[in-house]
Amino acid sequence: MNQSSVKIDGQRIAYAESSAGGGDEHTVVLVHGNSSSARTWAPLMAGDFGRRFRCIALDLPGHGDSEPARDAGGYSLPGYAAALTGLLRELDVAHPVVVGWSLGGQIAMEAAPLLPHAAGFVVFGAPPVASPQQMAEAFLPHPAAGALFSEQVSEAEARLATESFVAPGSALDTGEFVADFLATTGAARTGLGASAGAGQFADEIAIVSALRQPFAILHGEADQLINLDYLRKLTFPALWRGEVQVLAGAGHAPHREAPRQFEALLSEFMTDLGPAGTAR
């Protein structure tokens, strides 16, 4: 993978890019979750998928190698959406497929109205909600949830929090998750929590209901943070295959815990889109 950065409104945003892809294939833009980084996508980008498709994975402000946001607003969903759309503009990606994990999925939905020419969207670990009141139904209670919105986090707290990313009893080594969690600017977590609690995000139900592009919802069967029953109640015309796609045995991070299943589903979604430039 190639590492680079761009300036967006004076702020340096780092990103990784797969070394292959192009031709008539779509560009895939990968958006990581809370207290993670672009490197969570490294196995996907370094494998067959990254060799077929041009993949771009950004570090959100305050995460990975990107600079911290200039103010708390940069850690809200609108602030992150501005960073995402700014990156696409700087890299001249006109028709992306946006793939978002957890917070990254919420960002993808926030940005969708700003990306009318996007080819499609894929989210997982990211239930569409219309208001803060719906969060109690969409998200499952978990003892580690508090750390996801805390400025100061110990290594033990980060380890407990990242264990919620995988299925109970999973054999996946969460060391990389822990390192990224501890490297993230604490203000990113508190800023996100404060802004989301105050309702500073768009009506995601209305956004996905109005989409004309295909919109896939993937879900790890053993996700400890997201309520599958809530997801299954959602219906909207753009929903890919008409239902949530469940990955057996995986938790909140199926792209790392069930990489073959995840890549297969994502590849099927890309195939269904057809070549880049195909009229819909």
Model feature map: region roles:
Residues 1-12:
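N-terminal cap/lid segment of alpha/beta-hydrolase-fold proteins
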Residues 100, 104, 108:
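Gly/Ala-rich beta-loop-alpha elbow adjacent to hydrolase catalytic centers
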